[in-house]
């Protein structure tokens, strides 16, 4: 295991000691050791070398409550700013954000801040909570959770470029912001987690429709929550009643890995059957071309290329265009 990985994982293990999640230490270190030996991306070591080249800076201000903004342009000289931007661009494509680092605007494909603005008013206060973000991407929402006062934020996502992007951002925060010791990313899926039944809040945003067995996935989310804990689920939905579920064909909006798109009523039934209560649909929103688009930080195809050019209410395959719902529920 490289020095960087060892440091990242050890920091996570240390934060779990004497916490409600301490029993995770019975399995987690061995799991991460196996990951390091058998599952690392071919580019991973190169990415780590690039991370090591990021300069150490001293951001004078960090804002995680209204954005993810680390420092200002005036904190660094022009050469250092260009060096930082050049290195961060080596980790493209940047899909989830945006981030602001010493005056550099990482203009990501998704305006994840807009999603957070739709979700945040409807959830329990995160202050003092242990939070799990399943399918955390590059960690944008994790930082916002920390900014809301969460005691501990753990993100899980098997995509290793997201893992690297998260640590690129953390590199600029870790030495200037004490709570950064309480935010950790583990390169794994929820299916690799033992049922901890210990998190106060579990987020899963943009994952359910990628699962062949959505009921099993929802059960896995439930298994991570303590009794009374809160689930925040965001996913693609379709219009209809409690019997309506769209199973996409080979592709949906050019994505091959989309399986089930339920109506909000059907999704409510699923959650109820699995033992959730206080289930409420708090937001339904059509994804716009301003919220998901190509940028200089993600310069390949995006949403506009996946919709019918003659009718943007339909995907290029003829399905209803992406509509996303946020559902909040509690474990009985």
UniProtKB/Swiss-Prot annotation:
Q: Which UniProt keywords apply?
A: Transferase, tRNA processing
Q: Which positions are annotated as binding carboxy-S-adenosyl-L-methionine?
A: 96, 110, 115, 135, 157-159, 190-191, 205, 209, 324
Molecular function terms in GO for this entry?
transferase activity, transferring alkyl or aryl (other than methyl) groups
Task: Name the source's superkingdom.
Answer: Bacteria
This entry's Enzyme Commission designation comes to: 2.5.1.-
Q: Which CDD domains match?
A: AdoMet_MTases
Q: Which reaction does it catalyse?
A: carboxy-S-adenosyl-L-methionine + 5-hydroxyuridine(34) in tRNA = 5-carboxymethoxyuridine(34) in tRNA + S-adenosyl-L-homocysteine + H(+)
How does this chain assemble?
Homotetramer.
The protein's job, in short, is:
Catalyzes carboxymethyl transfer from carboxy-S-adenosyl-L-methionine (Cx-SAM) to 5-hydroxyuridine (ho5U) to form 5-carboxymethoxyuridine (cmo5U) at position 34 in tRNAs.
What the record says about family reads: Belongs to the class I-like SAM-binding methyltransferase superfamily. CmoB family.
Protein name, please?
Answer: tRNA U34 carboxymethyltransferase
Q: Which species does the entry assign this protein to?
A: Alteromonas mediterranea (strain DSM 17117 / CIP 110805 / LMG 28347 / Deep ecotype)
What gene makes this protein? cmoB
């Amino acid at each position: 295991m490289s020095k960087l990985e060892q440091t990242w994982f050890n920091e996570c293990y240390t934060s779990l000691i004497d916490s409600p999640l301490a029993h995770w230490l019975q399995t987690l270190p061995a799991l991460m050791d196996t990951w390091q030996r058998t599952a690392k991306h071919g580019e991973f070591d190169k990415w780590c070398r690039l991370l090591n080249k990021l300069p150490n800076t001293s951001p004078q201000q960090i804002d995680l409550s209204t954005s993810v903004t680390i420092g200002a342009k005036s904190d660094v000289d022009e050469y250092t700013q260009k060096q930082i931007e050049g290195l961060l661009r080596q980790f493209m494509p940047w899909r989830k954000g945006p981030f602001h680092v010493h005056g550099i605007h990482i203009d990501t494909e998704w305006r994840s801040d807009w999603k957070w603005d739709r979700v945040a008013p409807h959830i329990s206060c995160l202050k003092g909570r242990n939070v799990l973000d399943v399918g955390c991407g590059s960690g944008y929402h994790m930082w916002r959770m920390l900014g809301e006062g969460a005691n501990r934020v753990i993100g899980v996502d098997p995509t290793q470029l997201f893992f690297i992007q998260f640590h690129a951002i953390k590199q600029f925060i870790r030495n200037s912001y004490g709570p950064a010791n309480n935010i950790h990313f583990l390169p794994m899926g929820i299916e690799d987690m033992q049922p901890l039944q210990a998190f106060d809040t579990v987020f899963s945003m943009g994952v359910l429709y990628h699962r062949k067995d959505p009921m099993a996935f929802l059960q896995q989310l439930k298994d991570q929550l303590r009794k009374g804990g809160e689930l925040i689920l965001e996913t693609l939905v379709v219009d209809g009643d409690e019997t309506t579920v769209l199973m996409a064909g080979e592709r949906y909006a050019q994505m091959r890995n989309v399986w089930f798109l339920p109506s909000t009523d059907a999704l409510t039934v699923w959650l109820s059957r699995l033992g959730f209560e206080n289930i409420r649909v708090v937001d339904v929103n059509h994804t716009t071309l301003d919220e998901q688009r190509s940028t200089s930080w993600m310069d390949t195809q995006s949403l506009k290329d996946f919709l019918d050019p003659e009718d943007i209410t339909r995907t290029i395959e003829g399905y209803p265009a992406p509509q996303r719902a946020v559902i909040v529920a509690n474990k009985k």
